[in-house]
Amino acid sequence: MGCKSPEARKPISVKTGSFIENSAERNISLNKKENELIEQIILNDSLNDYISSNYGFYYYFNTKVDSTSYLPQFGDIINFNYNIKSINGETIYSKDEIKTQNYAMDKEEIFTGLREGLKLLSEGETATFIFPSQKAFGYYGDENKIGTNIPLICKVSVNKITKNQQ
């Protein structure tokens, strides 16, 4: 049991960026398939005028109020209802299951698409959003009813916006 200076361990194998490259390719392929599916839904829906948002999803207004109406800003409290459906229209969570929500804009965690969608709605408006999976619950799902990489349709109604007093 003598003193021995520590020896550096050598790596067993050299890792390349292949995992990340493969992951990126899978994501690009998934995104392309989802976009094609969403575009097909829009083409088949002649009743609604879809808007392509700057956030990377599509939506249309079920109920629209004056175009000069106030849109929520950072810290505003938004009282709203929504439901979640699969891309084929099957209800995953009903409005009654989710219940009325209060959300402090950009101060609390909700899924990305919903947070960005709420920024587009004024008090009294209702819109239907089609979110690709990366704007919904992404790879992990919601660990309950929503699985991995599932695009969603959400109908969102803003009941009230309380302006941030700060």
Task: State where each predicted segment sits.
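Cross-family detector of peptidyl-prolyl cis-trans isomerase
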Residues: 2-166
